[in-house]
Amino acid sequence: MARKSLIQREKKRKKLEQKYHLIRRSSKKEISKVPSLSDKWEIHGKLQSPPRNSAPTRLHRRCFSTGRPRANYRDFGLSGHILREMVHACLLPGATRSSW
């Protein structure tokens, strides 16, 4: 189980990313439209003004039940070993164990 502080940090980053999403997107569009280099530098400075944790690359996908940051399946939002346990217990509809 992940520490609660790490899970809360991820939630805070998600909130910040949603808050500054429009600012980042509009600044990136402006950079592509402006022809002069000096104006691009000014807009780039604006792009750096939001907090670092508001960048979408700082977000990390975590397991829904345990908070584990690695080996997550996007479709289920679970880490590998929790997914396996839930499939064996028939808690995930439509998921079957493979056999060959």
UniProtKB/Swiss-Prot annotation:
Keyword Lipid biosynthesis: no
Keywords: Chloroplast, Plastid, Ribonucleoprotein, Ribosomal protein, RNA-binding, rRNA-binding
Gene3D superfamilies, per database record: 1.10.287.1480
Keyword Transmembrane: no
Record Pfam families: Ribosomal_S14
A GO biological-process term: translation
Cellular component terms per the entry's GO annotation: chloroplast; small ribosomal subunit
InterPro entries named among the record's database cross-references: Ribosomal_uS14, Ribosomal_uS14_bac/plastid, Ribosomal_uS14_CS
Location (main, coarse): plastid
Classification via PROSITE patterns: RIBOSOMAL_S14
An example Gene Ontology molecular-function term: rRNA binding
Compartment(s): Plastid, Chloroplast
Subunit structure as annotated in this protein's UniProt entry: Part of the 30S ribosomal subunit.
UniProt xrefs under PANTHER family: 30S RIBOSOMAL PROTEIN S14 (PTHR19836), SMALL RIBOSOMAL SUBUNIT PROTEIN US14M (PTHR19836:SF19)
HAMAP family cross-referenced by the UniProt entry: Ribosomal_uS14_1
Protein role: Binds 16S rRNA, required for the assembly of 30S particles.
Family per similarity comment: Belongs to the universal ribosomal protein uS14 family.
Name this polypeptide is given: Small ribosomal subunit protein uS14c
Species in which this protein is naturally found: Buxus microphylla (Littleleaf boxwood)
Gene coding for it: rps14
